[in-house]
Amino acid sequence: LNVNLMLGQAQECLLEKSMLDNRKSFLVARISAQVVDYYKEACRALENPDTASLLGRIQKDWKKLVQMKIYYFAAVAHLHMGKQAEEQQKFGERVAYFQSALDKLNEAIKLAKGQPDTVQDALRFAMDVIGGKYNSAKKDNDFIYHEAVPALDTLQPVKGAPLVKPLPVNPTDPAVTGPDIFAKLVPMAAHEASSLYSEEKAKLLREMLAKIEDKNEVLDQFMDSMQLDPDTVDNLDAYNHIPPQLMEKCAALSVRPDTVKNLVQSMQVLSGVFTDVEASLKDIRDLLEEDELQEQKLQETLGQAGAGPGPSVTKAELGEVRREWAKYTEVHEKASFTNSELHRAMNLHVGNLRLLSGPLDQVRAALPTPALTPEDKAVLQNLKRILAKVQEMRDQRVSLEQQLRELIQKDDITASLVTTDHSEMKKLFEEQLKKYDQLKVYLEQNLAAQDNVLRALTEANVQYAAVRRVLSELDQKWNSTLQTLVASYEAYEDLMKKSQEGKDFYADLESKVAALLERAQSLCRAQEAARQQLLDRELKKKAPPPRPTAPKPLLSRREEGEAAEAGDQPEELRSLPPDMMAGPRLPDPFLGTAAPLHFSPGPFPGSTGPATHYLSGPLPPGTYSGPTQLMQPRAAVPMAPGPVLYPAPVYTSELGLVPRSSPQHGIVSSPYAGVGPPQPIVGLPSAPPPQFSGPELAMDVRPATTTVDSVQAPISSHMALRPGPAPAPPQPCFPVPQPVPQSVPQPQPLPTPYTYSIGTKQHLTGPLPQHHFPPGIPTSFPAPRIGPQPPPQLQPQPQPQPQPQPPPQPQPQPQPQPQPQPQPQPQRPVFGPQPTQQPLPFQHPHLFPSQAPGILTPPPPYPFTPQPGVLGQPPPTRHTQLYPGPPPDTLPPHSGALPFPSPGPPHPHPTLAYGPAPSPRPLGPQATPVSIRGPPPANQPAPSPHLVPSPAPSPGPGPVPSRPPTAEPPPCLRRGAAAADLLSSSPESQHGGTQPPGGGQPLLQPTKVDAAERPTAQALRLIEQDPYEHPERLQKLQQELESFRGQLGDAGALDAVWRELQEAQEHDARGRSIAIARCYSLKNRHQDVMPYDSNRVVLRSGKDDYINASCVEGLSPYCPPLVATQRPLPGTAADFWLMVHEQKVSVIVMLVSEAEMEKQKVARYFPIERGQPMVHGALSVALSSVRTTDTHVERVLSLQFRDQSLKRSLVHLHFPTWPELGLPDSPGNLLRFIQEVHAHYLHQRPLHTPIVVHCSSGVGRTGAFALLYAAVQEVEAGSRIPELPQLVRRMRQQRKHMLQEKLHLKFCHEALVRHVEQVLQRHGVPPPGKPVASMSVSQKSHLPQDSQDLVLGGDVPISSIQATIAKLSIRPLGGLDSPAASLPSLVEPPGLPPASLPEPTPAPPSSPPPPSSPLPEPPQPEEEPSVPEAPSLGPPSSSLELLASLTPEAFSLDSSLRGKQRMSKQNFLQAHNGQGLRAAQPTDDPLSLLDPLWTLNKT
């Protein structure tokens, strides 16, 4: 009864809910029918006699009520069934259901008499509804539908839908019956005894765990020190298989079997077109030269009175043809360099491509394999076995410890304790603890075995050391070979593309050159006819005088030489273009030293985009345009027998052509330069002889035509030469005729000056620049600068003239503002303005051929002015001998200076010591013999006569004395060898590489190993000296500050720069992926600030490897790498500390304001109280100390990894005054904070670990901090003030949105201006725009403290002093690899007084070796007594410098040793080329006299 009543009431609730929710009528009817069923069951229970007797009187009332509910809910069910019939348009059924519902409701109303009013109201409401529905349905059916009304029992009965179910009840459930009152019937004494037994078990466990932990700690430390990974100890199997990446390349080539064939065919076609173009250009040149020669002969025949033949139109057309020819020649020369490099690259890669497309067995054979003896393999196996034992011991120990813990945990003897007497408890404990004895024995045996295992491991590791070294070297070779093969595969497509571009380019050029050749032929024929006509007319007038003949002495020999060289070529070189086979373009030191080939933008039209580095090669020559009469000595110059060496040619124009922005070589050589074997004269002639047949070219600066304009900025390789051992230049083996002068005539006036055309044909008239020196005086020239050289400005020297009045001279050009030159600079000339302080003097005047004065060159990075007064006085006359001294220091890869090898055997010659430019006054007749380099090979521009000082006539009485030099003939070398070397260089011969010496050729031995040549990655550059000690630097900084101030001064410029940066960011971001960061959206604070996949920080030991942090590198050589990250979220603090631990970070910079900390916008991820460490995952962070300054809070934290006893300290620097939406209070605070950060960074070792920087999102304030940090370091290092937008773009290429606000950029600009002003004030220079007047004491008090105050005055923190000292550091010369970095320590300010340098005191060096020595001698050390030494820097000028000199980075025994490289571990581990007992002895080293091997590794 109760169950059914309750179920019916529950079903009623569901019925009411369904009706309120307007469920379907059929569903409501079924629910209502189920209510009827439940109440019918209850009614049956009420009719049960037992129940009736139990209830008594109320049984009738209950039954009546239940029956009323049955009828009522049946009426509801039939009402909704009627609605259902209405929806189905069964109108007869609708009337039947409504009739039934009305009947049942009437029954319910009868049974409801005596019920409360609420029930009566409900029934009345139901009657209204059902009655209304019934009447409406009946009328509709009667009058409209006329459907038959079926009987109710013929309709489908309504089945109930039970939606409720009864839940069973457990009578003993504690929730029903309450807690069990009999649960605690164990006696209290038994509980106490059980507790005592538990303590005994815990004591036993603690004792064993302590022993295990001690042994584990010893084992971990031992294994960490061994650095032996069992997985990688024996990975010899990896070398027996071809790596997957190489297999992919082999598979790709196997489906293209014609790869190499197509490449070779394409290059052969290109060579053919190249040869055709060169032949056509040569034909045009020969036509023009022949025409000019005939013209000269005609004028000599007819005299000056005879007018030139032919109409002026023909001459103008010929001039136009000549210009077109010069233009096409220049384009051809520029393209020929790319063509040569393309062939070199093809020859380099074609072997690798053949290998990759061949059988896999050959590929596998080409990879290095381990060469291990059986003994080595036995050592390996032994080590592996012992390492396996160590691992087995560990596993067993862990297993036994786990068993012990589980056994103790499960041991419960309460049942025994209840039945045991209290006096017997101890005895019971002892018996029960005996069950652990077996496990204790096993554990102690395991611990005891550790010492034996470690002893055996130590012995095995000692034997493994040699094998380990062999395997590591093998791994390096394996990776290197792999990279070379993959690079060759990747270069193939680019080679084919460039080859096709070259063919298209040369096809276009060929058509134009062919048209020009036809035009030149027709014009020359017309000219010849006109000349013949004029000659015939003149011959009729008078008898013709005998025509002078001008033989062409060496032209045929040159052609024979070319043919002979071509026959000498090896088979693989015969497809090279002719200019590569025509003999060496430069002396062999040039081979393999040019800049690496970058194809784009090259001379081929349409070539864009960067391309692969290819093998660097020699500088190609200018097209041969020398005269037919080769360097004939003038009568004014005395001749004497004995060969003379010519200087190696420099590929710069002698005609005043302005070089392009980055010319590789293609400037047309002077038509007046001698070509071929030299004439045996004492000195070069003072001016070109008149017999030259070269045309008087007036070259324009690159006429703008379609063909030339397609040659966009050519490859930047002009004079970018890398020093290194290289073979000596080949010398010709044929004898040279020795003409003997008939007489020594008096000095003659200089010939008529040639006219040069520079730029827009402003003719500079006057004699060729010559330099005259008194007789017998060793001529002093400035030493070649070591390091990047500023190119010479137009500063011609005044020339002596025989006439009383001076002729017009070229005016000095105004010096352009210094601009940074990405291209390597041309080399410095021997004459012209020179800085007065020479850091490294040499006695190699013949090794440094000069440029001609008057050649426009790109503006230098640092301007300088000549110092005519310094060292202008000639030293005492002394005839000293010249010997090849030690070669110059190795140069940085981008240096413009050219070290040449010493030529052959030493020759005694008069000294040409380098010094400042000499006084140009001629003091009388003179003939100073000059030692110059051997003959340039054919088809190569030879040096102009004024490349090396030559004896020149000057007015004065008496004959010109001559002193013939005793020169040894150079050793004969096969000239073809140089051409064969074109492809002999290796991938190391790119920038910074070394070239192995050739057999039997002298070895260049650098006195320093350039850091760029080392394979290791460069660390942070230190600033070891104050770069602003020189006034020139401060003056340059002032000028830069003036222009920098206005860059972002107004809002318009700032908006424009910001717009460009935003557009560049969108462009750069399209090519970079952030797919990994998107997978970890919960770890990103902002969904638009995520790291790029390419440079994100990868966690190595976390649950996953992701953290929102990016590596930001390459902002400045002096700025450490940074990790920009967001502030840690509550769930990523463990990742943050794990990154700090894995990256070995020592400095964390936090740029979050105090307000953000107080509002708890930033989760505290570091402890703030001592003794309260925070645990993040496996790492524990504790606070060691806190120091609060005016600008920041400095916390020293200790980081400890779980289960390790070693702790690591790091510094947490918090800058609290930078609000989230704003700027710091002043730039000064941030600048001081940056100095503090850098000082802390310099304290760590090593210096290549990053600094972690974070703000809120890791891009806004973090970006501004990184930008200003890098810019400040650039200024402190003495580099130019950096371009902030470029730095911003570089940062954003590594992390999007770095420097989020435009205001941040403006703030950084203002802060950098402020910092530069402080640097200037620190050195006593007022910033630009401020008065220079002496400041009063009150004014001085407002300036920043000077260096003395920083050390001695005030309460300056020690970190500030250390930061200042750190700013005085600089990497030594050998470590520099960029011009900008090395210039600060090399360029001398122009304003030094003349007394700052000692006068040169030439002294004779030691006597020479016998001149007949057939082999090259090693360079002689200490042969530089006649060269002025650079003045020492003197003692430190202030306490700050004294303190700076005592830092570990800058300490040395003598202040003059500053700038020398510190000794490090690498100095003892790396071999040094060219060092040994022959190295120069440092005279300023007080310990150098103790042991001759003292300086073996000293750099």
Swiss-Prot record:
Q: Which residues form the Tyrosine-protein phosphatase domain?
A: 1055-1315
**From start to end residue, where is composition biased (Polar residues)?**
754-763, 1335-1348, 1464-1473
Q: Which Pfam family, giving just one, matches this sequence?
A: ALIX_LYPXL_bnd
GO MF, one example? protein kinase binding
Q: Where are the sequence repeats?
A: 788-789, 790-791, 792-793, 794-795, 796-797, 798-799, 800-801, 802-803, 804-805, 806-807, 808-809, 810-811, 812-813, 814-815, 816-817, 818-819, 820-821, 822-823, 824-825, 826-827
Subcellular location, record wording: Nucleus; Cytoplasm; Cytoplasmic vesicle; Endosome
Q: Name the reported effect of residue 1255 to S.
A: Abolishes suppressive effect on Ha-ras induced transformation
Name the active site residues.
1255 (phosphocysteine intermediate)
- Tissues where the protein occurs: Ubiquitously expressed, with highest levels in brain, testis and kidney, and lowest levels in skeletal muscle.
- The biased composition feature labelled Low complexity covers 1427-1450, 1482-1499
Q: Which GO terms describe its biological process?
A: cilium assembly; early endosome to late endosome transport; endocytic recycling; negative regulation of epithelial cell migration; positive regulation of adherens junction organization; positive regulation of early endosome to late endosome transport; positive regulation of homophilic cell adhesion; positive regulation of Wnt protein secretion
Binding partners and assembly: Interacts with GRAP2 and GRB2. Interacts with UBAP1 and CHMP4B.
Q: Which family does it belong to?
A: Belongs to the protein-tyrosine phosphatase family. Non-receptor class subfamily.
Q: What is this protein called?
A: Tyrosine-protein phosphatase non-receptor type 23
Which organism is the protein's source? Rattus norvegicus
